[in-house]
Amino acid sequence: MSLTAVRPRRPAAAVPAPSPTPAPETPRRPRRSVVLLVFVLGMLSATSSLATDLYLPAFPQIAHDLGATESQVQLTLTAVMVGLAVGQIIVGPLSDRFGRRVPLLIGVAVFTATSFLCMVVTSAEMFTAVRLLQGLAAAVSAVVSRAVVRDVFDGDSAARLFSRLTLIVGLAPMLGPIMGGQLLLFGPWQLLFAVLGAAGVAGFALVYFGLPESLPHSERVRQDPKATLRLFGRLLRDPAFIAPTLTMGFSFAMTFTYISAFSFVSQSEFGATAQQFSIIFGINTLGMIIGNQVNAALITRMDTPRRLIAGLLGATASVAALGGLHLTGNATLVTVTAVLFVMMFFTGLISPNATTLAIVSRPTSEAGSASALLGTLQFAFGGALAAAAGLTSTGEATLGSMALVMVVTSLAATGVYLALVLRRRSVSLAAA
């Protein structure tokens, strides 16, 4: 037997035990700057928001030109909400399977085309149909924007980015009616949709050149329709998701009631012009932006659920005051505007925190579906419940009907969240 000489081994150097790696604040940062990401996503979301707000001052003019009633014109706004609701439930799973970028490009292209189609409608029915299709297209931007945030950020970082997005999106409803009112001085209401079409073209260019794919192929989920339905079922049974989602739905119904009804209320009951309405609407939206910035400042001082509860309680108190003004006969354009400003301030606390709690409760692979279900319920509640403000004897929204729907929906938002959170805590204590 031959022996092979073996070089004596050096004693192995002691390898220190790996120290636990702290969880990064942002799991994956995009190659592009955060500023560019916020701008692109904000532009997309703002364009979708302009689809609902830019033409609000033109409601009376549209009703006259199309030979429609006020409720028929309001129905065109509801059609957008229905499109947003249905579209999101479809787009969410598709974005989890095929990525974010391609569905977004298709959605923005369809949004642009329908914006130009709105310029040539000849009846309220045709207008409503095109607006429904436009809402379906706008749903893509709404879903994908939230999903991209979840792809890139987590926890407080996601909350900060949602706050920044809400700030940008908040500028759209503030500037939209003002822009719409001023544009009406230079042309008919069709000009407003030409502007929307131009914004769609700009949004397409921003996505194509400035937004890389944020969902890697390794994290994409290929599900059949049955698996998607099972996922939605799990989401609906998860208190961590459904509590903020239902809260967001009822809260949006409160806000959307104001958005859809106040154009007629301010101009019919208080004698405001289209330009005056647009300025008042912008002032009230400024309240939401201020509330959003206060929310961002409170992130390190107060946890997300408490910020959400503070917003819910404040909004409920505000709309209760609006109802009180109506019942006591003290409602004037000034007092109503002041109360609505406070209500919108607290809405700035509700939206980003409810969105954060709902989306961050799910893993990245389910972010698109979770975002879709959140958006679907949000716009379904908004479109269905806000329409109740027009269910009066004349078929027109009044201050009283608007205030009533806003009080009911704000109470529902607060009650649902508190009930589900308390139930979840009691179950956790029982399990412990």
Predicted regions and their residues:
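Paired small-residue
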Residues: 110-117, 125-133, 334-342
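Helix-breaking motifs and short loop linkers at transmembrane-helix boundaries and internal kinks
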Residues: 65-67, 99, 120-126, 271, ...
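Conserved MFS/SLC helix-loop-helix module at the cytosolic interface between two early adjacent transmembrane helices
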Residues: 86-124
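Cytoplasmic helix-loop-helix junction between adjacent transmembrane helices
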Residues: 130-171
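A late C-terminal transmembrane helix in Major Facilitator Superfamily
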Residues: 357-396
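Helix-loop-helix hairpin linking two adjacent transmembrane segments in secondary transporters
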Residues: 126, 163-209
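Juxtamembrane intracellular "pre-TM" segments in multi-pass secondary transporters
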Residues: 22-31, 212-245
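Helix-to-loop junctions at the C-terminal end of transmembrane segments
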Residues: 88-99, 291-305
